[in-house]
Amino acid sequence: MLLGSHVSMNGKKMLEGSAEEAHKFGESTFMIYTGAPQNTRRKPIEELNIEKGHEIMKAHGLSNIVVHAPYIINIANTVKPHVFELGVEFLQSEIERTQALGAQDIVLHPGSHVGEGTDAGIKKIIEGLNEVLTNDNNVRIALETMAGKGSEVGRNFEELARIIDGVNHNDRLSVCFDTCHTHDAGYNVKEDFDGVLNEFDKIIGVDRIKVVHVNDSKNDIGAHKDRHENIGFGYIGFDALNYVVHHDTFKDIPKILETPYVGEDKKNKKPPYKLEIEMLKQQKFDEDLKNKILQQ
């Protein structure tokens, strides 16, 4: 089972450190940002320590790296041309880094239309993706299902389908299915996940799903908030998320936890991933999990 989490990539070790952290958490896959998600400062490819990273991965049975594009990319912006242009250029360079890292998919938030309306946002995203997907490689852009917070585009399956249909090289587009976002967007992930998946299949096709983000939600269905919660401690609940993780449809697909670190002290929060992954492998909810995470 391909199950992992977001891990850090920084310092001199870069990918080597990411692979070590993923192994420490008992993971078989992992997701990284190539640098800080809120800025465009990036190390050159030759400083990402890729060879060492792959050696660690091979030694510990890790595979299927997933890359996440930074939040600052907004190719749905029709108001500020420089924001759109920066997004296109930076996404192109992130795809080069993704390919160098040996990853197949780079997850992208489709963007926000900043008040100009969904149609304008979708049109701009299509324009941007058509510019980006001319480079000759096999990296896919995995459009993420969004919660519908603010002016986010991709808040329902129909919006993602419109983007995919408008892109010329859409064989290079996949989908990252986020359980928290989809729940927050109003889909019944908790009680009828197969129904949600069937709807997705009719509108987009489940074969497009190449990454799953496994997150509980701090808010009730349809809240359009996007606030992740630890597995089993939110409104989706353990049973539903355990069902998603062990679903046949996602057997060969990386399932990535992006659940929050635990603890009141901001400087001393603990990563939940090792124990959450163990719990999902055992398929039994541990209501004392947060205390155990704090005691790590």
UniProtKB/Swiss-Prot annotation:
Keywords: DNA damage, DNA repair, Endonuclease, Hydrolase, Metal-binding, Nuclease, Zinc. Binds 3 Zn(2+) ions. It catalyses: Endonucleolytic cleavage to 5'-phosphooligonucleotide end-products. SMART domains: AP2Ec. Pfam families: AP_endonuc_2. The keyword DNA damage applies. Zn(2+) 3 binds at H181, D226, H228. CDD domains: AP2Ec (cd00019). It comes from the Bacteria. Its EC number is 3.1.21.2. Zn(2+) 1 binds at H68, H109, E144. The keyword rRNA processing does not apply. GO terms for molecular function: deoxyribonuclease IV (phage-T4-induced) activity; DNA binding; DNA-(apurinic or apyrimidinic site) endonuclease activity; phosphoric diester hydrolase activity; zinc ion binding. Its cofactor is Zn(2+). One of its GO terms (biological process) is base-excision repair. Zn(2+) 2 binds at E144, D178, H213, E258. Endonuclease IV plays a role in DNA repair. It cleaves phosphodiester bonds at apurinic or apyrimidinic (AP) sites, generating a 3'-hydroxyl group and a 5'-terminal sugar phosphate. HAMAP family: Nfo. Belongs to the AP endonuclease 2 family. This is Probable endonuclease 4. It comes from Staphylococcus saprophyticus subsp. saprophyticus (strain ATCC 15305 / DSM 20229 / NCIMB 8711 / NCTC 7292 / S-41).
